[in-house]
Amino acid sequence: TVATKLITFLLVPLYTYYLSTKEFGITDMSLTVISLVLPIASMSISDAVLRFVIDDSNDQKSVVSYGLIVIGLSCAIVALLLPVLKLSVFGGLGNYSGYFLLMYVSTALMTYAGNVARGLNQIKIIPICASISTLITGISAYLLIVRQGIGIQGYFISVSAGPLVGTAIYTIV
């Protein structure tokens, strides 16, 4: 949505002003690694669930359940691989491996929940959850990075909090 893009656009100056160059590089590395690892570790289950929920309306519950199990397994796989982030090629991301895992889990769940909603034809809830998720991310980034001054930890918490709230809304609705 336009609101989501606007808030995301407004967060970039906040990040560049309050995070050091190294910290900003680590945040960028985390986004890059997650965008590469998520489809591999989860075997793109979010896309598969979308397809099979649409194709097989009689077995939607089991498809969604199996997909959630795969997402859980992907989170476990990423947790087991966290020591790899200590390699110098990841530019210090290993120092924030717990935060990285939280970010991975929240991103995986939000992506999965969005595709399940799309597959179940709950299209109206998708922009609502995306907007609320982005709003929570923006507010928490401001509170944690600017007001509390906790830097990169605040970044990781804020970019995890938004999707977790969005996922919770998908689950409730």
Predicted regions mapped to residue ranges:
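Hydrophobic alpha-helical transmembrane segments
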Residues: G98, P127-V173
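Residue-level recognition of pore/gate-forming positions within transmembrane alpha-helices
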Residues: T1, K5, T32-S35, I71, ...
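Membrane-embedded alpha-helical segments of multi-pass transporters/permeases
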Residues: F9, P13, I40, A79-L87, ...
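Transmembrane-helix boundary and interhelical linker motifs in polytopic inner-membrane proteins
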Residues: L19-E23, S35-V70, R118-K124
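Alpha-helical transmembrane segments of multi-pass membrane proteins
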Residues: L36, I40, G72, A76, ...
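Alpha-helical transmembrane segments of multi-pass membrane transporters/permeases
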Residues: T1-T4, K61, F100-T107, A117-Y142
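Membrane-interface helix-capping segments at transmembrane helix termini in multi-pass transporters
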Residues: L19-S30, D55-Y66, A76-Y104, R147-F156
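Signature of the first transmembrane helix
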Residues: T1-S46, G138
